[in-house]
Amino acid sequence: MNKKIEELNKLDKKVVLAPMAGITDGDFCRKFKDLFAIVTIGGYNLDSATYKASRDIEKRGRKEFSINLEEFNSYIIEQIKKARESNALVSVNVRFVDIDEAYDKLLTIAKHADIIELNCHCRQPEITSLGIGQELMKNKNLLKEFLTKMKELNKPIFLKIRLNCIPLKELIDNLNYVRDYFDGLHVDCFYPGKPYADMDSLKILAEEFNDKIIIGNNSIDSIEKAKEMLKYSDFVSVARTILKGNVEWIKELNKENI
């Protein structure tokens, strides 16, 4: 396990702020000082195809970060700086189709952030129709192309993934195909038709990738649920519950220093 990942394992907090489109920027993160182990900003578009898709999503009334690509590098430096006021590590969630077009922005992110998180999670049709977001986990060769180049950035690379989009065996096989090129998995334990997380699949995934950092996500809004998911993950992440102001349990969990 490399030194950067060892440092992540030594973090004394167990809750991560998950990315929420159009919401989790530096100004949002800085409001939560000393609450999270990691704050994730984004997701951000790094090329013209995803930028256009993002603008199209906004036309449907959904929030997005549609940042002018020419202004992105200066924008992201400022957002990371603000996010650091949370006293957490800063992860940046990104998406792109053309890694060559995205690469100068990835270089800027790598210079200023602690973690780069590749979005293999988005299910908006404007994104999935480009073959990325959750569709990326079906295309191991494209995923490997992206990760091979991202590995050169010399930063921990995490994948934000969604369970139950493809069969678990296929997901594991495709992740094994790129195993040498990523350091962590941010796992949305999405369970279609169920009001709770798919813990069984998370357990299998965590056992298969026990050399990686695992962040569990989905429906975590209490100490009890967090502790249950932490049986199979190194961290848990939260999103919508934060928008409801439900943070006291996180403070209590931090005090336990588990």
From Swiss-Prot:
Cross-referenced InterPro entries: Aldolase_TIM, DUS-like_FMN-bd, MJ0144_FMN, tRNA_dU_NifR3-rel
Pfam families documented for this protein: Dus (PF01207)
Alphabetical list of SUPFAM superfamilies matching this protein: FMN-linked oxidoreductases
Descriptive protein name: Uncharacterized protein MJ0144
Species per Swiss-Prot/TrEMBL record: Methanocaldococcus jannaschii (strain ATCC 43067 / DSM 2661 / JAL-1 / JCM 10045 / NBRC 100440) (Methanococcus jannaschii)
